[in-house]
Amino acid sequence: MHTQRRSALRHFVHDHSLTLVSALILGTWVILYLQADPQTHFGAFYGNAIADWSGTVLIVIATKWLFEKGSTESRRMPRHFKNRVREFLISHSLTLFVVATGIGWIVLYSALNPMDKWGEVVGNIVSEWTQVLGMILFTKVLIERGSKESRA
């Protein structure tokens, strides 16, 4: 029994190692930032790293579970839908998720002083979310010659 649990844990860690390591790195930056003075180089770095690694965790998790019709970066979608609304929601779940959570970050940012310690970090997260949304939309229509992910 003990060996089965260890094997299951090992498979879980292996199968989700990118998510786990990315989240661990993000958590490390948050812990370091909690103790840091944002007016120092290290403090400013930790705050920026939180926003950057939040975007990484978003990309890793969202692209694992969600879809974006027309994006070469997205997972393949299920083929058959009987309900048009459900089809739309699933087909664009990646964009809808990033927009919905982005609105949440914007609401939080608007309630914070942008010059305060966490106001600056949340502002950077809003910027990161905007960049991710832009890339999702860009990959639907734009190409980059020589990129294996691109259509051309």
Label every model-predicted segment.
Residues 33-65, 72, 107-144, 148:
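A structural feature that tracks compact, well-ordered secondary-structure segments
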Residues 5-23, 84-98:
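Alpha-helical transmembrane segments and their helix-start/interface "positive-inside/aromatic belt" motifs
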Residues 2, 6, 39-40, 83, ...:
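Short, structured coil/loop segments at alpha-helix boundaries
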Residues 21-31, 96-108:
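Hydrophobic core of alpha-helical transmembrane segments in multi-pass integral membrane proteins
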Residues 68-81:
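Membrane-helix interface/capping segments
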Residues 1-14, 68-71, 144-147:
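N-terminal soluble segments of membrane proteins
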